[in-house]
Amino acid sequence: EAGDFTGNLFTLLNPFGLLRGGAPASLFIFHGANFLALKSLGGIRERARSTSTVAGIVTVVAGGTLLVWNQIERGPAWTWITVVVAAGGLVVSLLADRAHRDGWAFIASGVAIAALVVSLFGSLYPDVMPSTTDAAYSLTVDNASSTNYTLRVMSWVAVIMTPVVLVYQGWSYWVFRKRISAESIPPVHVPTRG
């Protein structure tokens, strides 16, 4: 009420809230394991694939449950498209992982992440943080946005800095483009006190 939180701990720790935290966490573990499998060899790669398989199965179950529950609970009709794209990305990624196609597994899990984000935020729109007591207290895109001056400054910062970040990320990826293995890691030298 009046901008104050009126619930308790169990208002926040409900099954849907826990699923909204756990499903994306498992999806990012899955995505990270796919990337690690893509960039490694030998034992590191096998452990990453093993983690990817387990996290992928957990993600398909938890993520599928979250997407359908969220869609039924509050999603508009157009977000069913993103639900299908996210589910398809998860399934394709899991199948590509099983076929040892690390690049496709990584790309498909990235598509699933993008579709999940669009689905979850699309189901909230125009709210950014909906109120559970009265819709009048919800934070919307309009009342949570910055002033026009701030948005203008941030737009110019983004116009200048986004290409810099993209070039740096491209260069970083190019420098670390080869797969690594445990054998390519140099031994650690501990300095002795003299």
Model regions and ranges:
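Transmembrane alpha-helical segments in integral membrane proteins
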Residues: 26-39, 161-178
